[in-house]
Amino acid sequence: MSTTVRPDEVSAILRKHLAGFESEADVYDVGTVLQVGDGIARIYGLSKVAAGELLEFPDNVMGMALNLEEDNVGAVMFGKSTAVKEGDTVKRTGILASIPVGEAMLGRVINPLGEPIDGKGPIETSIRLPLERKAPGVIFRKSVNQPLQTGLKAIDAMIPIGRGQRELIIGDRQTGKTAVAIDTIINQKGKDVFCIYVAIGQKGSTIAQVVSTLEKYGAMEYTTVIASSASDPAPMQFIAPYAGAAIGEFFRDTGRHALVIYDDLSKQAVAYRQLSLLLRRPPGREAYPGDVFYLHSRLLERAAKITDDLETAKKMNDLPEPLKPMVKAGGSLTALPVIETQAGDVSAYIPTNVISITDGQIFLEPNLFNAGQRPAINVGISVSRVGGSAQIKAMKKITGTLRLDLAQFRELEAFSKFGSDLDKATKAQLDRGARLVEILKQDQYVPMAVEKQVAIIFAGTQGVLDQLDLQYIRRFEEEFLSLLEHKHSDILNSIAETGQMDVDVAKRLKEVAEQFMSTFKQKVTA
């Protein structure tokens, strides 16, 4: 018996089947690898790719488009380029390089892409900010007016740093540049300053040592470490500082204070030179590309003190969408870039560039370091162009003549080596200078509260220590500060709370110092 199928039944069955059919297709813009080597890939296609856009290579290797040429795209790879070969397909991601930010990043060690490398599990944060971002415009900034205490007497007294400033730490290798930076981080404990330490092109063992030091002194609670070691590809070392700036900007734009340390930008410039030469960009002075100044200026301009007016702050240029509801006024981002010089040559290309971008420099000298002066700061050529307006009044008052006294001491010291017959005034000046130099010496990882710095420097500039042997200065300092802390804490509290030292406080402090000196001299000479 034959069955007849009615046409309306057929159409109903077809309609039923077609109802569940999805015609959507995933569309990718893809290209083909023409050439690969040394962490660089030349790609055919990707005609609509943006400069700085992330690309996806096979085996989950990420890359970034840097050269947009007529017939190909030059890209750098963040992973192992050995996994990529000629003819491989490359996908556009449609997103620019970004990094996760937020409080969850504190206490963690990450790579420049924001991936944790400390074995403490994934980072729980939903906010991502772009690595590259325009610096705040002039209208959104405020002049530096709050101090950022480093805890180092030589810096806080003569080369003061303010919140929102860019202060360069420059010197030869092994002169204590990283030590100054780490001491500054340790000194921010309890001061509501979030710190970001960016290690660029350093040995893995050195980075591990820095992390363990920060943990030992309880500084990792408010610090993020971005590690791009010497074994990482050059593109990772190139983007590391921008990752640090992005994390710092989150705190800056949400009304808080952040400190970012780039250790060091010389190695970032070398990594960028390597990339540029491999991408066949024309070389300039010292084989660096023509835009190496812009490499550092666009990074360091992101450090700023933001205006206190909330309505103005909310209109800040280039504000990413995730940040807009969280914006608060009055935040700051302070940058301490580090530059390594070769044989003290500050007139080389990268050092002169960064000196001209920053608001001052702390110059560390091997001769001073080897002579036992730590930190080995050359006060003569170190300067802070804007920090003076942020320095507390008490410190400004007592250090007015300190820089001049030390400069004259250095000059007289050089001349005194030629002859032994010195007049009384010259000898007194030499003695005072030697004691001031001794006062400014400080052990590593022992930052000092600003009120204690004021007390001991005041004792030195008032001539209280002039008759004391140099070998006893450090001991006097320890015992004198201990006495103030336990028996005259009101003096220290007054300086700490008001930031000033009025006539009465100065008079009392001098009396206490002189009384203690007389008993101390009896004790050491007995």
Curated annotation (Swiss-Prot):
Compartment annotation: Cell inner membrane
Segments crossing the lipid bilayer: none
A cellular component term, taken from the record's GO annotations: proton-transporting ATP synthase complex
Gene: atpA
UniProt catalytic activity: ATP + H2O + 4 H(+)(in) = ADP + phosphate + 5 H(+)(out)
NCBIfam families: atpA, PRK13343.1
Keywords noted in UniProt: ATP synthesis, ATP-binding, Cell inner membrane, Cell membrane, CF(1), Hydrogen ion transport, Ion transport, Membrane, Nucleotide-binding, Translocase, Transport
Site (Required for activity): S382
Enzyme class, spelled out: translocase
Pfam families assigned to the protein according to its UniProt record, in alphabetical order: ATP-synt_ab, ATP-synt_ab_C, ATP-synt_ab_N
Transferase found in the keyword field: no
Topological type in the membrane: Peripheral membrane protein
Species for this entry: Chlorobium phaeobacteroides (strain BS1)
Reported function: Produces ATP from ADP in the presence of a proton gradient across the membrane. The alpha chain is a regulatory subunit.
CDD domains: ATP-synt_F1_alpha_C (cd18113), ATP-synt_F1_alpha_N (cd18116), F1-ATPase_alpha_CD (cd01132)
Family matches, as InterPro entries: ATP_synth_asu-like_sf (IPR023366), ATP_synth_asu_C (IPR000793), ATP_synth_asu_C_sf (IPR038376), ATP_synth_F1_a_nt-bd_dom (IPR033732), ATP_synth_F1_asu (IPR005294), ATPase_a/bsu_AS (IPR020003), ATPase_F1/V1/A1_a/bsu_N (IPR004100), ATPase_F1/V1/A1_a/bsu_N_sf (IPR036121)
EC number: 7.1.2.2
Family: Belongs to the ATPase alpha/beta chains family.
Annotated residues for binding of ATP: G171, D172, R173, Q174, T175, G176, K177, T178
Subunit structure: F-type ATPases have 2 components, CF(1) - the catalytic core - and CF(0) - the membrane proton channel. CF(1) has five subunits: alpha(3), beta(3), gamma(1), delta(1), epsilon(1). CF(0) has four main subunits: a, b, b' and c.
Entry protein name: ATP synthase subunit alpha
GO molecular function, one term: ADP binding
Keyword Transport: yes
